[in-house]
């Protein structure tokens, strides 16, 4: 299905717990560019460290549904949401411990389709997750349009972080942010190396 054929666009957000998904969404919801005339359905698949502001949700005509387990995320439930809300768009904050492939392989309601896939990463814990849950992260970023590393510090091995993504998904846009916002992309000419490929052997 092409984007022109999609009636209900899905904005899919993945990332491990406390990676900044909720913070990113809470900020986005109040931005002028986010506002549309129709209903937005926000499906939360885990409880993050940030609670969404009810006033912001009402102002942006955003309805929230919370799913507590992967078993609750079914084609039938999504069809029911489509019938009940008639959403103009859907945002899914996916649980970082669930395989992304489970959703990618799911039969979606008629004319629903993913138009943007974003992954958020807490740079301060990235290496720990890569050491322990590499396969989950690789699956998250394989089809991502954007990978956002937040809580970055200049003494972190950011070039290595970038290579870890590019070896899996060369087309993904990679953004590094610190507390002040986006860090200038100093890696524009940096090509991924065999080091990153070696790191991912066995995934």
Locate each region found by the language model:
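Pre-Walker A adenine-sensing motif
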Residues: 1-3
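Nucleotide-state-sensitive switch-loop elements of NTP-binding domains
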Residues: 5-14, 19, 23-116, 123
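Short, charged, surface-exposed secondary-structure boundary motifs
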Residues: 76, 127-130, 186
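Conserved C-terminal guanine-recognition region of P-loop GTPase G domains, centered on the G4
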Residues: 105-112, 123-168
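Well-ordered beta-strand positions
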Residues: 116, 145-146, 199
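C-terminal accessory "lid"/substrate-recognition subdomains
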Residues: 154-194
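Single conserved hydrophobic/aromatic residue that forms the stacking wall/gate
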Residues: 192-203
């Amino acid at each position: 299905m092409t984007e022109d054929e999609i009636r209900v666009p899905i904005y899919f957000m993945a990332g491990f717990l406390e990676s900044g998904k909720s913070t990113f969404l809470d900020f986005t919801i109040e931005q002028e560019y986010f506002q549309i005339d129709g209903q937005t359905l926000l499906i939360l698949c885990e409880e993050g460290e940030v609670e969404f502001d009810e006033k912001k949700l009402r102002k942006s005509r955003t309805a929230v549904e919370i799913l507590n387990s992967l078993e609750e995320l079914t084609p039938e439930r999504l069809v029911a949401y489509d019938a009940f809300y008639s959403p103009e768009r859907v945002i899914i904050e996916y649980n970082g411990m669930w395989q992304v492939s489970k959703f990618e392989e799911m039969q979606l309601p008629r004319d629903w389709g993913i138009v943007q896939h974003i992954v958020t990463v807490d740079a301060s814990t990235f290496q720990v997750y890569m050491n322990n849950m590499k396969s989950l992260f690789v699956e998250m970023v394989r089809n991502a349009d954007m990978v956002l590393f937040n809580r970055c510090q200049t003494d972190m091995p950011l070039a290595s972080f970038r290579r870890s993504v590019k070896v899996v998904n060369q087309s993904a846009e990679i953004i590094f942010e610190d507390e002040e916002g986006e860090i200038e992309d100093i890696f524009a000419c940096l090509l991924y190396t065999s080091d990153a490929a070696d790191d991912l052997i066995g995934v």
